[in-house]
Amino acid sequence: PERSPEVWFVREAMLQSGVALFLDVHGDEGLPYVFVDGCEMLPSYTSAHAQRERAFTDAFGRANPDFQTQHGYSRDKDTKVNLALASKWAGDRFGCLSLTLEMPFKDNANLPDPQTGWNGARSRRLGGDVLQAIHTVLAPG
């Protein structure tokens, strides 16, 4: 708790309450795309995880024109099984859909905007649209 008290307190709250879905949102300086990175390389990953992830990415793709699934991190990236990363730890510990959502720092190569590039308005829209995908995965029935 001394080094990162905010991480410790959030982790403790998660352990007490449980987690239905975990989304760690980042900006990627190298890849000019909006994408998610899942937990498919973890030993605890199952076909049920894959189905939830597919439902999420399908719904997110319908909701937001910036989101895509063709470009992202390679499957052999060394962080794919690193349980020190929040999304990997949460996915392994809680068995929930757990993803890192990456967005570009400058612009989306698939849908460039020469006037503004990637900006706050696009980030806000992405945040609103991700709620539709979350609802699709978590809604009963």
Which residue ranges define each predicted feature?
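Structured catalytic-domain cores with a bias toward divalent-metal coordination
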Residues: P1-G141
